[in-house]
A protein has these predicted regions:
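Loop-helix junctions at membrane interfaces
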Residues: 1-217
């Protein structure tokens, strides 16, 4: 696929997801937009300047941390957009617009999943921070989307390599990426960071009135 076609496909993916997000969430407060922007910027910095590349296109980084963190602090749509925008932009700045297409989708999935588990299943915002099982629920919410990425990353990577890059790439190679463990290590490390940051930041952000109250999308 030509570079122009990659850019057009990326534009279509971005417009579709942003449009769907607006329809789903409908309103974003100024504070939510600001915090989402901060998380997107942190995702970009964490990936672009603090990553360790590996053979085969994999790399160790903590960019996904801020995708899941935004989802827990705000909601799934905000978290998904923070990671999708921040990390897709990081791919573009790194000269990989083809990767940015699948990155945008993958990070949005992480955010939506973490947000759904945190706010729909566990209703973290309504829980007492000192209640029994609170820490376990925070860990599970953070891990949900990040561990799902262990499987969605190679799956979408297969379609990217075959249909966007036109490479010789097999399902077996995609499964090898799972077995390689780099994405899993990323997910575990990011989960630990998310839990620590969430427990530290939530009380302060609540006192500052920067977090939404009640049930969220």
């Amino acid at each position: 696929m030509s570079t122009t076609a990659m850019w057009l496909l990326l534009a279509v993916v971005v417009v579709a997801i942003v449009f769907g997000s607006v329809l789903y969430k409908r309103t974003f407060t100024t504070k939510e937009l600001a915090l989402t922007g901060v998380m997107a910027a942190l995702s970009l910095v964490a990936y672009l300047f603090f990553r360790v590349p590996f053979y085969g296109g994999s790399s160790f980084h903590l960019g996904n941390t801020f995708t899941a963190l935004a989802a827990l602090l705000l909601d799934g749509v905000s978290g998904g957009l923070a990671g999708a925008i921040g990390l897709a932009l990081a791919d573009i700045l790194a000269g990989d617009p083809g990767y940015a297409i699948t990155t945008f989708v993958l990070k949005f999935i992480i955010g939506i999943t973490c947000g759904a588990v945190a706010h729909k299943a566990f209703k973290l915002r309504e829980l007492d921070k000192h209640s029994s099982g609170y820490l376990v629920k925070v860990i599970m919410a953070a891990a949900s989307g990040l561990l799902l990425n262990v499987f969605t990353d190679p799956f979408l990577g297969y379609f990217r390599n075959v249909y966007i890059f036109g490479q010789e790439y097999t399902v077996a190679q995609a499964l090898t990426k799972i077995a390689g463990g780099v994405t899993f290590v990323n997910s575990v490390a990011s989960t630990v960071c998310v839990v620590v940051l969430y427990l530290a930041l939530r009380p302060a952000l609540e006192r500052a009135g920067l977090l939404p109250k009640g049930e969220t999308n």
